[in-house]
């Protein structure tokens, strides 16, 4: 299920993928970015209901792995039915991780169909699924010996690919803009920077960090709307998102260490109204 906003003159299609616990309506507001920057003429847009949301079947999302399968199948469907073969993936939270998974893990299937992922934008994404599973277990005070079993079961359910489900592996080849707020309690800035540090020298990957704003709600912050819009537009127009990218990288890497310490101290604080909607640590229930 999803909405296709077709632009006959555009040769690229943007897939805007929501996070867990919401549906395609949550992604609709981001169309305004493209109207405000006159980029709406450059793309067709497809906004899907990924599994476990909206009109799609109820099922497990496995921290975004299953969203990756959905986004991959969405590209195949748009290729088969509408002849679309050039995509930009724009995803939030698990939809961000799913976008990265679709482009990298399922790349061979895309190539066979002549499908190309041109660029990606990921906002408030999970950055390392193994660490996220362990973090969620810690928040729920699951005993350590059970956590190791849970991780093994989870790895089995994602086709023994758990060690690949991290941004430092998934993001290298495709030009990508990572958007993150330092105050995100669901997908923490500290965890993201651990991944980003490994790929910070890769010119294909750009990072835009905001001081405030909650999980997947940076654009909704009135003070940031213009800056967020400009970052997305500049990235899509092949301009530098941060004028002093290297300086920003150094500053962010240093600050991430501080944030990580604070995050560890508050490991049992769910703190965000979106936490329960976001957390996917229920994958082993009722199956």
Task: Cite the ranges covered by each PLM segment.
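The serine-hydrolase catalytic nucleophile loop
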Residues: 20-34
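Short alpha-helix in the alpha/beta-hydrolase fold that links the catalytic acid
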Residues: 30, 188-198
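Conserved alpha/beta-hydrolase
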Residues: 35-57
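Short beta-strand/loop motif that positions the catalytic acidic residue
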Residues: 171-172, 178-180
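C-terminal catalytic histidine-bearing segment of alpha/beta-hydrolase fold enzymes
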Residues: 197, 201-287
């Amino acid at each position: 299920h999803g909405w296709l906003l077709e632009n006959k003159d555009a040769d690229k299609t943007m897939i805007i993928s929501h996070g867990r616990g919401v549906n395609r309506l949550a992604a609709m507001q981001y169309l305004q970015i493209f109207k405000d920057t006159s980029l709406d003429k450059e793309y067709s847009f497809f906004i899907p209901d990924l599994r476990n949301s909206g009109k799609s079947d109820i099922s497990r999302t496995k921290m975004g792995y299953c969203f990756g399968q959905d986004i991959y199948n969405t590209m195949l469907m748009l290729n088969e039915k509408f002849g679309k073969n050039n995509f930009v993936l724009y995803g939030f939270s698990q939809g961000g991780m799913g976008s990265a998974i679709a482009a990298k893990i399922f790349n061979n299937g895309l190539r066979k169909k002549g499908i190309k992922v041109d660029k990606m934008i990921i906002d408030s994404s999970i950055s390392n699924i193994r660490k996220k599973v362990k973090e969620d277990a810690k928040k729920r005070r699951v005993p350590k010996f059970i956590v190791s079993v849970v991780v093994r079961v989870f790895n089995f359910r994602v086709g023994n690919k758990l060690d690949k489900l991290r941004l430092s592996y998934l993001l290298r080849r495709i030009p990508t803009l990572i958007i993150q707020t330092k105050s995100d309690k669901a997908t923490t800035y500290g965890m993201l920077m651990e991944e980003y540090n490994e790929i910070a020298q890769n010119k294909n990957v750009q990072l835009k960090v905001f001081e405030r704003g909650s999980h997947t709600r940076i654009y909704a912050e009135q003070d940031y709307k213009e800056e967020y819009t400009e970052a997305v537009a500049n990235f899509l127009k092949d301009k530098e998102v941060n004028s002093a990218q290297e300086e920003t990288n150094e500053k962010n890497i240093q600050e991430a260490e501080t944030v990580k310490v604070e995050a560890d101290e508050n490991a049992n604080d769910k703190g965000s109204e979106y936490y329960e909607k976001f957390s996917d640590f229920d994958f082993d229930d009722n199956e």
